[in-house]
């Protein structure tokens, strides 16, 4: 800018420099005065003098961020600004608003950075948190900073460990349909109310046997389970952390199925409630559908198939339990298939092939054990998606054992095959090739019998028939079951009744949902409050020993292996701190030596309950005070689920964080620790801010800010480049940060731009060049109040003219409706309309200026505070009353009708708002008389308040 041009700028214009000064000053004032502190009903955060003490409460919650080293780009704060606008509006509307921000700071990225650099993950994470706090403060977010938490702080994860212990020391009573303390289960066993699994009295069981019985009921338990082992990362991954092609989401390493001892959470016990209570939530339907599908409730029957037990008489005769949604097809079950990892396989495999075993069944091996071992090795290298692909050729091996079909009495061979997954159902299926396409394909490969049990529809010429029809080939009168001629529903019911009566099975509900893998072989996570005694039994530490703090270690990394080494075993970083692992404790029966659990909790642990800690963050005696929880999150009335009033975050958390948090919250509810049975009453998914990236002829990304558009093409200098649309990222060289925008225009402009880009729930492209439009809007708001030349107020106490007053109240009415519905973009559009009208006036009437500033405040709070102060108000507008429209001024005095002749607008007519249809018709015909050329119109249609259509 030239000196002459600079001198032309009025001295009191709203500029980026002035915005910076105003914003920093008001941020300091808010912090110093505790402007956004929300009072609790009791305790140290109570404040009976607060302007909203005793008011209707509102709890607004953001999904708290993981503080990465890259800091925020302009896409990250979209939801935070949206919730801030909503919270500011609600505060001005008279509510006591709790809005806080914390940090989800444990996790793999910080640990991997520590491994690469040798810097302790706490050092980098705390530095990242400090940077995030500075960036968020610069945006003017109205958080109650007293309530900020970080999951890595011992004062926080002490309570994460406490919640874990509540879950560990609880069991799910299926009759009562709720969790109960484990002590009540033990009392039922010891009092004879509940039978032990083998029928022996409780008093006859040893301590080890009693522990074993109780552990089978616990909601948190250790299990030898098929898990996703990633040698390249040296850790076990949850299903959700594995990509569809069977690789780790982090690092892109191959992942293998292995049986390993891990901590699990019995989330499946809550399958029905997690599913049914979705109907009580105000959530987007796509998110509900994703959870319903993830839980995957299926109604059918468990059927037990007796077997011979390999060569081991000690095992007895184990039964293979299968779950099927079609028990009516049992007459067509001609073989069984087990997942290669199924726990019974090793018990069933004999040393030699039975007489008459077909060569095609053996996998080319000399013995069943060799065949099983070889097949397992091949299956372990495949992803679940590869194993279940419909197009792949079916493979498997006979394990050398047979089962008995309980209804036909036939001996049917048992195979293992990779298309059956250990983690789904029971890990075993009864194969009915006549009614299942995959079973048909397998039967064809291995030349197995095919029996149809449902009559195909007329004209059917396919293979497996999966449709409806009467039962056929389904009679065993000697066993008391005849299904022939019955429809599917009746046949299913009759079969289930027979199974239960004969002791061969029972009706059942199963879920696609699996128990939650809850341990990680990492360093940077919450330690478990668990030790092991000399027998290897897990023992929960008492609450007065919490927190179990994460110790310092020299090497943060788990031992990693060749990414292809599926047979490797986990070795955790904590296991190398022997002075921490091996500990002497007095747990009530004198000092003894114990071994600490060396796995850590997954990154999801802290986020499962953090919304509760915001309520009472300084409480050293409870994770949350009951009265405080009831005030902020309690049910509103009969049947209400309770929870936060608004939760805003990305849809990508639909089946991870959101499901896990619901599970933890329901356990806490069952045990009486919270009054709400859902954590998040209303969920809103914000869209994403995306960006254009540009590549040169080599495919290399070039700086997006240096690219210019000419004649529909894009150039870096004189070189044409290609444009693509998607994410922002450092590697894409298209990152724009909030810091840059605040420096160039101010935080208020950045906030207004993000809220005006489109509906909050819709993704949209970032356009740096368009930000100036929001800046100019705020300049016009400033000019409506402040004289740019003198700095004097342009606000006058003279009344507004009728048109301006009516416009104001129409805008107020529209903005209030938009703010309640979080339609922020249309709110901004209305404010622009009002501001543009004011700039045409010689001075701004106070009765319009003050409502304008109050309505601008949620979006541009700093400049609004400054203008409010300049208009003579000594206190912050944060608790000023949001404008309310006068209903009398919302009634239009006149209406303008466009008049169409044969579909084209030929004129307009203004008539009184209460004009009759005859008056409107006459005025419209008069207005288009020239277009009618003296002819009588064939038809005149008056759409009240909208338009007039004339057909000539």
Curated annotation (Swiss-Prot):
It is an enzyme of class 6 (ligase). One of its GO terms (biological process) is leucyl-tRNA aminoacylation. It catalyses: tRNA(Leu) + L-leucine + ATP = L-leucyl-tRNA(Leu) + AMP + diphosphate. GO terms for cellular component: cytosol. PROSITE patterns: AA_TRNA_LIGASE_I. Its EC number is 6.1.1.4. This is Leucine--tRNA ligase. It comes from Salinispora arenicola (strain CNS-205).
